[in-house]
Amino acid sequence: MLAGAGRPGLPQGRHLCWLLCAFTLKLCQAEAPVQEEKLSASTSNLPCWLVEEFVVAEECSPCSNFRAKTTPECGPTGYVEKITCSSSKRNEFKSCRSALMEQRLFWKFEGAVVCVALIFACLVIIRQRQLDRKALEKVRKQIESI
């Protein structure tokens, strides 16, 4: 018998569990980093940092409004670093993940985990109270029958 089946007002245990799992999965997918587009096989279209050594000229920083509109590398994360390729001496921009962004994502994840833990702790407490009431009712009926 399903948890809560046959009793009005109690949520179906499995349905609630699936709902929470789906919510958590959706939350994790929303926070997942965006994968870069698949690049073509020709090396002429590849950024120089994929095929040769490079040096970071400017550290990872947030894109300005203008740069976000004009530089496609700002799209995936909103942060970009300027690099200089060693052999070709080309200056290019590369999308990057900043420590601030990673910290923000970490705390969002931690908050979601704490919320899910609190929800399940409440469910455990509610179920324990139901079982205690059932046990007390059985004991009461046994005492009355004596």
Swiss-Prot record:
Transmembrane feature ranges: 106-126
A family per Pfam: JTB
Keywords from the named record: Apoptosis, Cell cycle, Cell division, Cytoplasm, Cytoskeleton, Membrane, Mitochondrion, Mitosis, Signal, Transmembrane, Transmembrane helix
Gene Ontology annotations for the cellular component aspect, listed alphabetically: centrosome; cytoplasm; membrane; midbody; mitochondrion; plasma membrane; spindle
Signal peptide (from-to): 1-30
Tissues expressing the protein: Ubiquitous. Expressed in all normal human tissues studied but overexpressed or underexpressed in many of their malignant counterparts.
Any Gene Ontology biological process: apoptotic mitochondrial changes
Cystine connections: none
Membrane topology: Single-pass type I membrane protein
Entry annotated with the keyword Transmembrane: yes
GO molecular function, one term: protein kinase binding
Protein location: Membrane; Mitochondrion; Cytoplasm; Cytoplasm, Cytoskeleton, Microtubule organizing center, Centrosome
Cytoplasmic side: 127-146
Induction summary: Protein levels increase during the S phase of the cell cycle, are highest during G2 and mitosis, and decrease to low levels at G1. Levels are lowest at the transition from G1 to S phase.
Family from the record: Belongs to the JTB family.
Protein name per its UniProtKB record: Protein JTB
Gene: JTB
